[in-house]
From Swiss-Prot:
A single GO BP: 'de novo' IMP biosynthetic process
Pathway given in the UniProt record: Purine metabolism; IMP biosynthesis via de novo pathway; 5-formamido-1-(5-phospho-D-ribosyl)imidazole-4-carboxamide from 5-amino-1-(5-phospho-D-ribosyl)imidazole-4-carboxamide (10-formyl THF route): step 1/1; Purine metabolism; IMP biosynthesis via de novo pathway; IMP from 5-formamido-1-(5-phospho-D-ribosyl)imidazole-4-carboxamide: step 1/1
Domain MGS-like: 1-149
Protein family per UniProt: Belongs to the PurH family.
InterPro entries associated with the record: AICAR_Tfase_dup_dom_sf (IPR024051), Cytidine_deaminase-like (IPR016193), MGS-like_dom (IPR011607), MGS-like_dom_sf (IPR036914), PurH-like (IPR002695)
Origin organism lineage: Bacteria, Pseudomonadati, Pseudomonadota, Gammaproteobacteria, Lysobacterales
Descriptive protein name: Bifunctional purine biosynthesis protein PurH
Gene Ontology terms, MF aspect: IMP cyclohydrolase activity; phosphoribosylaminoimidazolecarboxamide formyltransferase activity
Protein's gene: purH
């Protein structure tokens, strides 16, 4: 099969995305490939002074119904589906000539339906019929026909044509066929998701339910993983077809061993947390929980403070920065501790050179900027034979909407620390407690079945790290059901608390804070994380 190259004599071009169209047509013509085309695609090729035959002239049947019917014809599909050496006589009898290459991309259904003013009629008019049919015909017959669905594929396609003097290999045809079927599947899934979400078709703008009756999601494999959650499990990482800029799925691995399942779970937690901060920040994560978070004047300051929170847990952790990682900080980290993964938007050349001395350390770059703050719109979690779907927890609060519920109000400095702690606690597994002071974590209590134990653990962590809790603040991801959590915090020296509120015993909790001289803010927002 490796030597199965076939020449391209005729190509049919019909594209909604005209990017690179004229350049592509010129190269095809240079190899004496006859061009067929439709509608606007043919017009652009012709206006460039290049010869092209309209499909309507080929079929003898005009485009009709405002372009809804133009390629649904045996001459077109027979030209794509005809098998060399099997269907030759039938094709000759009916005057059907082979089509060896199909260049086609579909009507932009997802882009049109994403517009706020898209009506149901607009959506229906954007459903491509002839395009998917041609893609399926060409892809099914990959033994003879090649098909490209995106301008991104043109360079490789043309490179092979040029290298092999107008011929394409079986491997290339098969790979393009797989991509075409994937493209059609994604397209049909988008249509299904949209129509399944329409709850009232009679309004000017169709009312749509947030969760469609049938959910069809498409993901693309980025890489196979070293192993799954445990070494006896296999794993792979798939990304959205259109990943949000600045999210983990856009990473580039600059060095290091193959990533594992746990590496990526932890990396996502670290990256999403560090992206919340405007000033230089460092987040160290272990087992999907932050074990140290800090903001500083530079990466080095932020790392030193984050590491000091829990040096024991930081060993073998994932470390994320929201600024360019410099060589001095990289050297300081690697000379001090074992690191599984580094994440940063950029790295100094000297920092990468030093990291290269530790060849197994994984170094990920995620291009990011202030404009790249998008996150997942929905979260998914597999359960037995099912899938839980929820809107992502993207709720942010501003300090001016916080409600002081105690006699004592927090100072301006305490409010800044409370806002810092509140940003961090969102990324800690429930029940979650964060002690913080001076824009750094002092102690973190994560994943306990009772909130009071998380508070106690945060205090224990601070004591183990020889960090003074006195004067610190505390954040809780959910309300305190009893006063015991406040009592435990007061015993360690906490002076201000931020929590959602909403407990049946809020009055008891507030009274406890007043007894201990603690200022308390209610956010009205819970941040459970499981």
């Amino acid at each position: 099969m490796a030597s199965d190259f076939l020449p391209v004599h005729r190509a049919l071009l019909s594209v909604s995305d005209k990017t690179g169209l004229v350049e592509l047509a010129r190269v095809l013509l240079a190899y004496n490939i006859e061009l067929l085309s439709t509608g606007g695609t043919a017009t652009i090729i012709r206006e460039a002074g290049l010869p092209v035959q309209d499909v309507a002239d080929l079929t003898g049947f005009p485009e009709m119904m405002d372009g809804r019917v133009k390629t649904l014809h045996p001459v077109v599909h027979g030209g794509l589906l005809g098998r060399a050496g099997i269907d030759d006589a039938v094709m000759a009898k009916h005057g059907i000539a082979p089509i060896d290459l199909l260049i086609l991309n579909l009507y932009p259904f997802e882009q049109i339906t994403a517009k706020k003013d898209c009506t149901l009629a607009d959506a229906v008019d954007t459903i491509d019929i002839g395009g998917p049919a041609m893609l399926r015909s060409a892809a099914k017959n990959f033994a003879r026909v090649a098909v490209a669905t995106s301008p991104d594929q043109y360079p490789d396609l043309l490179a092979e044509l040029q290298e092999h003097h107008g011929q394409l290999s079986a491997e290339k045809r098969f790979a393009l066929a797989v991509a075409a079927f994937n493209h059609v599947a994604q397209y049909d899934a988008a249509i299904s998701n949209y129509l399944s979400s329409v709850s009232d078709m009679h309004t000017t703008l169709p009312l749509r339910h947030e969760f469609p009756a049938q959910l069809n999601n498409t993901f693309v494999k980025m890489t196979e993983l070293r192993y799954g959650e445990n070494p006896h499990q296999t794993g792979a990482f798939y990304r959205d077809v259109h990943p949000q800029p600045g999210t983990l799925a856009t990473f580039q691995q600059l060095q290091g061993k193959r990533l594992s399942y746990n590496n990526l779970v932890d990396a996502d937690a670290a990256w999403e947390c560090v992206r919340q901060f405007e000033a230089p920040a460092c987040v160290i994560v272990k087992h999907a929980n932050p074990c140290g978070v800090a903001v500083g004047m530079a990466c080095s300051d932020a790392y030193e403070a984050a590491y000091a929170t829990d040096p024991t847990s930081a060993f073998g952790g994932i470390i994320a920065f929201n600024r360019t990682l410099d060589a001095v900080t990289m050297k300081s980290i690697l000379d001090r501790q074992f690191v599984e993964v580094f994440i940063a938007p950029y790295y100094d050349a000297d920092a990468l050179a030093y990291a290269a001395k530790k060849a197994n350390v994984r170094v990920l770059r995620i291009p990011s900027s202030a404009a790249m703050k998008a996150t997942n719109q929905y979260d998914f979690k597999r359960i037995g034979s099912g899938l839980l779907v929820q809107s992502a927890d993207t709720m942010h609060i501003h300090s001016d909407v916080l409600r002081t519920v105690t006699t004592l109000a927090p100072t301006d400095k305490q409010r800044r620390d409370l806002m810092f702690a509140w940003r961090v606690v969102k990324y800690v597994k429930s029940n979650a407690i964060v002690y913080a002071k001076d824009n750094r974590t002092i102690g973190i209590g994560a994943g306990q079945m009772s909130r009071v134990y998380s508070a106690r653990i945060a205090g224990i962590k601070a004591a183990d790290a020889h960090l003074a809790v006195t004067g610190s603040v505390m954040a809780s991801d959910a309300f305190f059901p009893f006063r015991d959590g406040i009592d435990a915090a007061a015993a360690t020296g906490i002076k201000a608390v931020i929590q959602p509120g909403g407990s049946m015993r809020d009055n008891e909790v507030i009274a406890a804070a007043d007894e201990h001289g603690i200022a308390m803010l209610f956010t009205g927002i819970r941040h459970f994380r499981h």
